[in-house]
Each structure stands twice: as structure tokens, then as C-alpha cells.
């Protein structure tokens, strides 16, 4: 048994008041630059349960707060959305060297690859209907009702867009290792062309896209994952991010490999009770590509400076940044 398994076993025996608990089959799950992710079996009291450990890495692609992610899991699992059940949050680094949390594993499921031209095959329409409906239910939820009204973010519907631009402009300023003229041009355009005020302030998932949810063999979405960037904001932020071309496997007419764009928007509008006004959504789509570029700029720096040498950071800093620079250049050129 590895040292991590031994320490995890000791922690869970105390946390769950289960002196007979044993940890087995602990294995690192590849990917995930903001948290180290492991799966394992916890056996105690006649149970054999699959669990997931999410531990802070020595360095992170983006600065995220594990308490935020855990609370989002709690809130939306409690609301009945397909979200894993959270089990334990530990901010004390002593048990496992770094803060971490534990949640249930959703078994016998897969994710869709953003590199595949048809990631969901015959289930694409069924999955798409669920995907945009779940996103809409997140948008429709009142942050006060789900206990997340104190989340980070701007609560003024007139100021929320510029708040998010400033947030990601700061990331670019802190992490760029070489000039980023296209990104800077996008920031200027977003500032000079503000969108209409937000219709409401919602909990924004922050990374709602293909690759961040699990589906079973029957095409049912079983879990929405990776809530570490969740915050308060304009619900159109999630919609703009979800339909970004990067997640479309080369088929921009089928965002995320699921539904045609117009149908996706209709599903979201119907389920959320909100409107994706074209001018506002266009602004948030350009913002989405800026946000992506800022994240990939951070990835490149983390990898180049040796703080996080996960290959996903090298890929993101190379391919994804170039992709979003091209998207931004095309979109800004079309607006000229």
C-alpha cells in the first residue's frame, strides 16, 4: 500500500467513524490541471464504495478555491441535479500534505472527447437536451435558495461583464510570457462594446462543456463535474463557454458535439426562462474565447517554469492558445 493510501485510510477511519475501513485500488486519474484526482475503493461496514479524491496540487493551472468547488457540489447535489455526492472537505493539509475533498465516484460512465468529431454518436441529441437543460437549471436557481449568495463575483447586473473582463485581464497580465496582441485586442473590444445588463445574477459553473460531464451507456448524463471556477455572474457566461468552437471537435455547427446551435439555445431558453439575446450572447462568446486564452496562457507559464509539468499544460499552452487566438482574430475581424 502506498503512503497516500495509508494516510487516506487513517483519515477516513476517523472521519467516517469506521475503524474497519480499508482503502484499495487507489489510482491517479490523468488530466485535471487544477486538482490531482484519484479514484479508490473504500470498504467498511459491509459496503464497497467507489470514491474520488480531489487534492490540491503543488501548483495549479488557475487559482481555485476547493471550498468553492465543494460547496457547489453540495448545493446542486441537494437540488437534485446530476452532481456527485460530496463526502468530506479537509482544509488542514496535515492528513494528506495538501487540502483535499472526497466525493462519490459515478461508475460505468465516460466523458466525451473534445477532439472527436462525433463524441456521443447516436445519443448526441438525447445528451444535448439534458446538457442544456441542466445548465439552464443552474442558471435558473436563485443563489440565495441554494446557499451560495456569498460566492465570489459581481452582483450588479450592470457591472458583471466588466468585472469578468478585469478578472481575466489580470490573469493575462500576470502570466503572459510573450506579447499577446490578439488577446489584448479582444480585451479592448470587450471593454468598448459592453453587452446589455445581465437578466439576473446566477451561479455560473465556469467550465460547463463537453469533457466535464459523465454519461452512461444509455446516453444519460450522470454527473456534472469540475465546479472549481464557479462564481456569481451572468448566466450567459456558461452558455457562451459551452458553445465555444474549441469544444466542437471541428464541427462548429454542432457545439460540443451535441445539438445544432439554434436548437441548443432554444432548449436553454425554454428550461431557464431566460433569453439569449443575440447581441449579449455574441459578447459572451467573444469573452469565452478570451477566458480560454487566459487559461492557456497560465498553462504555458506553469509548464515552462516547471511548477506543473502535467502534459495537459503543454498541450493547452500550445494547441488551445493558438486555437483561441484564431477564433478571436476571426471574430474581431468580422466585427471590424
Annotate each predicted stretch with a short phrase.
Residues 21-27:
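Conserved N-terminal boundary motif of the eukaryotic protein kinase catalytic domain
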Residues 236-273, 287-306:
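Active-site activation/catalytic loop segments of kinase-like enzymes and analogous catalytic loops
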Residues 1-20:
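Juxta-kinase regulatory segment immediately upstream of eukaryotic protein kinase catalytic domains
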Residues 203-205, 210:
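Catalytic-loop of the protein kinase fold
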Residues 27-185, 189, 193-200, 219:
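ATP-binding pocket architecture of kinase catalytic cores
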Residues 225-230:
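Activation of the activation-loop gatekeeper triad in protein kinase-fold domains
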Residues 294-336:
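Helical subdomain adjoining the active site within ATP-dependent kinase catalytic cores
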Amino acid at each position: 500500500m502506498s503512503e497516500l493510501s495509508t494516510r487516506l485510510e487513517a483519515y477516513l477511519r476517523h472521519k467516517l467513524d469506521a475503524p474497519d475501513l480499508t482503502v484499495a485500488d487507489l489510482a491517479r486519474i490523468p488530466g485535471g490541471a487544477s486538482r490531482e484526482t484519484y479514484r479508490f475503493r473504500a470498504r467498511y461496514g459491509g459496503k464497497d464504495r467507489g470514491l474520488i479524491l480531489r487534492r490540491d496540487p503543488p501548483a495549479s493551472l488557475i487559482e481555485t478555491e476547493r471550498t468553492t468547488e465543494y460547496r457547489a457540489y453540495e448545493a446542486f447535489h441537494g437540488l437534485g441535479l446530476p452532481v456527485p455526492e460530496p463526502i468530506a472537505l479537509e482544509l488542514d493539509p496535515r492528513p494528506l500534505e495538501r487540502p483535499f475533498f472526497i466525493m462519490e465516484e459515478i461508475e460505468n460512465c465516460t466523458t466525451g472527447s473534445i477532439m472527436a468529431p462525433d463524441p456521443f454518436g447516436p445519443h448526441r441529441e438525447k445528451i444535448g437536451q439534458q446538457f442544456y437543460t441542466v445548465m439552464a437549471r443552474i442558471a435558473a436557481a436563485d443563489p440565495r435558495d441554494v446557499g451560495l449568495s456569498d460566492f465570489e463575483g459581481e452582483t450588479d447586473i450592470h457591472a458583471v461583464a466588466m468585472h469578468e473582463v478585469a478578472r481575466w485581464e489580470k490573469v493575462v497580465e500576470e502570466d503572459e510570457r510573450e506579447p499577446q496582441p490578439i488577446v489584448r485586442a479582444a480585451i479592448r473590444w470587450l471593454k468598448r462594446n459592453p453587452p446589455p445588463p445581465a437578466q439576473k445574477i446566477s451561479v455560473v459553473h465556469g467550465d460547463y462543456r463537453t469533457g466535464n460531464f459523465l454519461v452512461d451507456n444509455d446516453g444519460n448524463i450522470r454527473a456534472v463535474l469540475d465546479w472549481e471556477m464557479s462564481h456569481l455572474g451572468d448566466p450567459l457566461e456558461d452558455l457562451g463557454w459551452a458553445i465555444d468552437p474549441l469544444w466542437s471537435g471541428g464541427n462548429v455547427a454542432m457545439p460540443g458535439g451535441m445539438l445544432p446551435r439554434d436548437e441548443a439555445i432554444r432548449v436553454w431558453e425554454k428550461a431557464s426562462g431566460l433569453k439569449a439575446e443575440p447581441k449579449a450572447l455574441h459578447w459572451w462568446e467573444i469573452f469565452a474565447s478570451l477566458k480560454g486564452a487566459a487559461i492557456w496562457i497560465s498553462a504555458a507559464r506553469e509548464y515552462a517554469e516547471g511548477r506543473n509539468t502535467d502534459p495537459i499544460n503543454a498541450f493547452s499552452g500550445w494547441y488551445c492558445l493558438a486555437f483561441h487566438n484564431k477564433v478571436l482574430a476571426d471574430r474581431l475581424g468580422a466585427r471590424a
